[in-house]
Amino acid sequence: MASSVFSRFSIYFCVLLLCHGSMAQLFNPSTNPWHSPRQGSFRECRFDRLQAFEPLRKVRSEAGVTEYFDEKNELFQCTGTFVIRRVIQPQGLLVPRYTNIPGVVYIIQGRGSMGLTFPGCPATYQQQFQQFSSQGQSQSQKFRDEHQKIHQFRQGDIVALPAGVAHWFYNDGDAPIVAVYVYDVNNNANQLEPRQKEFLLAGNNNRAQQQQVYGSSIEQHSGQNIFSGFGVEMLSEALGINAVAAKRLQSQNDQRGEIIHVKNGLQLLKPTLTQQQEQAQAQDQYQQVQYSERQQTSSRWNGLEENFCTIKVRVNIENPSRADSYNPRAGRITSVNSQKFPILNLIQMSATRVNLYQNAILSPFWNVNAHSLVYMIQGRSRVQVVSNFGKTVFDGVLRPGQLLIIPQHYAVLKKAEREGCQYIAIKTNANAFVSHLAGKNSVFRALPVDVVANAYRISREQARSLKNNRGEEHGAFTPRFQQQYYPGLSNESESETSE
């Protein structure tokens, strides 16, 4: 008897260890912010000339359009990223699908509902329908539907899309939804070839509906859904349906594309706005407590506090109250990483939203541990990017709808035009951070005065001014800044520097 109990306990303990290890690897692939579990570039890369990108090809559907950026361009291949922009019209449904690589979605405008179907999670949403026959209400029939959680999203939301997890989006608003998707091709979750593959569960991408915007040849992403590849007989047997229904699943004669129009709208069970806010607040508090406990007890996240079924999949980054840095005369900066948004541990990406006021300037910086994909939402910004050779690899104005890839460690300087600017930067690390050259907590502030004075051949007084000119400003700087000392940085150092 004792032997039997011990045997059962041993099996249970082994299973627990296996689950612990797998969940830890899944949700915490890297605890070191200086290291990213990406596979790296698949080729030797030279970032000696950057450019602002716009979508290269469009695929039109019944209720929307998907626009593809040029994935064959060297900059996308070297950074291991893939980008699309998607527009979903009111009552438009982006049919369920999954991809081989993880990504994040930024909602530029609009609102709607979405679902992520995590494998093995229970159907916690239940609703009843009443269906009437053509003969009248006397023969009405009630049926019950159960499904996984439905999430509401709105403008300014960041949505996480794990690899291999089916998802759908629906526009239940009055205006089109515009969203930009950024995928990480080099993520270790991808064990296929180094490119994005989309597996449709319904609908299709019709090749005849494709339209190249600028005439260049890029990779085709058209195809049928996965059911079209199965035999009708085996499919009908596996799903317990007849052959006619099986053929409908294959969508062989469906010309609506991947974004379809729902004539009378979807009947979805959704929590009220108050319930959503209460749930989000409780979830945020729970995650902060869990993160604090993890920091106190262990540097590693064991993966058991959070799982697929309860993890938060969206967060709003546009809310001014969430800003990490705010200057009333210059603008605000808001970032989300895996500490604020734990599912990013699985995605291994993060995001920063910047709102610069008229003529405001961003402190020069470089991305320490990630590439950055900057998408201009509104306004315009002058951007300069410098390589390790001190060469200007980009100097231009970034306009709404344009995308700029900034390689890791390349120095960046940005200044808003007269109308100001707003942009989102998606980064290839779950805990991306930057190193600023000026302002509070900057490189200059951290250097000793004598190091600065001798390095640039300036006086100690000038070095002190260089270190402290921006006072307590951090990130976004006020425009038309007045110099606090006379020009002379290019002159020979004064005798004070050699004392």
Swiss-Prot record:
Cupin type-1 domain span: 50-247, 315-464
Main function: Seed storage protein.
Keywords annotated in UniProt: Disulfide bond, Seed storage protein, Signal, Storage protein
Keyword Disulfide bond: yes
Family named by the database record: Belongs to the 11S seed storage protein (globulins) family.
Protein name, as recorded: Glutelin type-B 1
Pfam families reported in the protein's UniProt record: Cupin_1
Signal listed as a keyword: yes
Listed CDD domains: cupin_11S_legumin_C (cd02243), cupin_11S_legumin_N (cd02242)
GO molecular-function term, one example from the UniProt record: nutrient reservoir activity
Signal peptide: 1-24
Record gene name: GluB1-A
Assembly: Hexamer; each subunit is composed of an acidic and a basic chain derived from a single precursor and linked by a disulfide bond.
Stored Gene3D superfamilies: Jelly Rolls (2.60.120.10)
Lineage: Eukaryota, Viridiplantae, Streptophyta, Embryophyta, Tracheophyta
InterPro entries from the UniProt entry: 11S_seedstore_CS, 11S_seedstore_pln, Cupin_1, RmlC-like_jellyroll, RmlC_Cupin_sf, Seed_Storage-Functional
Disulfide bridges in this chain: C45-C78, C121-C309
Ranges where the record places region Disordered: 467-499
SMART domains: Cupin_1
BP terms from Gene Ontology: seed development
